[in-house]
């Protein structure tokens, strides 16, 4: 039942606060909202974590500690088997198939999949007074800036300019991470809405190295 209390608490805090302003004589302090950590790992098996599988050969002491202090869900299901739609569903609470992406995943140059104005769990929590951050792989698209009067192809991206419609415009106060998968171009790190260092070379596809899919 702890999960229900958490859900109700997040929703009830604004209402409780507004009621307390009407009853100024009430000195009862509002409960402190809990910290929330959401980890989405690619290609992690159900039995990889010791908390779920005592015979696992992978040490996971921190995750085990989090599991013992919280609730373990033993019959949970993802709404997709691949990265992008899973992330879309997680952040928006919608079935992934309701997005414009009907198969596969986005690239590092794709436009935003989360529609402008669409509420996310990040924007919802931000409106409740939370400070929100996203660290790691985004893989939901954003708008790159392009060199003026160019053909607006991948080679024409202006990495010196800020990105638009990325994580910080979808509810997150802070972002540090990569556009898509590690093996997907462009290989740059983004902090908030700007690259941390301008790319200085291009590597084309190389035979036998499947991780470099379409060059840098």
What are these regions (language model features)?
Residues 9-18:
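Bacterial N-terminal signal peptides
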């Amino acid at each position: 039942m702890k999960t229900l209390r958490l859900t109700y608490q997040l929703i009830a805090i604004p209402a409780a606060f507004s009621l307390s302003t009407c009853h100024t004589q009430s000195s009862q302090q509002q409960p402190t909202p809990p910290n929330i950590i959401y980890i989405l790992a690619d290609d992690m098996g159900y039995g990889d974590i010791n908390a779920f599988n005592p015979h696992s050969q992978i040490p996971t002491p921190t995750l085990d500690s989090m599991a013992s202090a919280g609730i373990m869900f033993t019959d949970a299901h993802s709404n997709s088997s691949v990265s992008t739609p899973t992330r879309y569903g997680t952040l928006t609470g919608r079935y992934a198939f309701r997005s414009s992406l009907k198969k596969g995943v986005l690239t590092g140059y794709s436009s935003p999949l989360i529609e402008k104005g669409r509420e996310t769990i990040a924007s919802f929590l931000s409106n409740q007074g939370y400070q929100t951050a996203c660290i790691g792989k985004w893989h939901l698209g954003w708008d790159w800036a392009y060199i003026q009067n160019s053909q607006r192809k991948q080679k024409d991206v202006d990495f010196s300019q800020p990105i638009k419609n990325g994580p910080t415009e979808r509810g997150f106060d802070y972002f540090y991470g990569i556009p898509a998968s590690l093996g997907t171009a462009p290989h740059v790190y983004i902090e908030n809405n700007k690259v941390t260092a301008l790319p200085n070379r291009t590597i084309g596809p190389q035979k036998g190295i499947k991780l470099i899919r379409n060059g840098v």
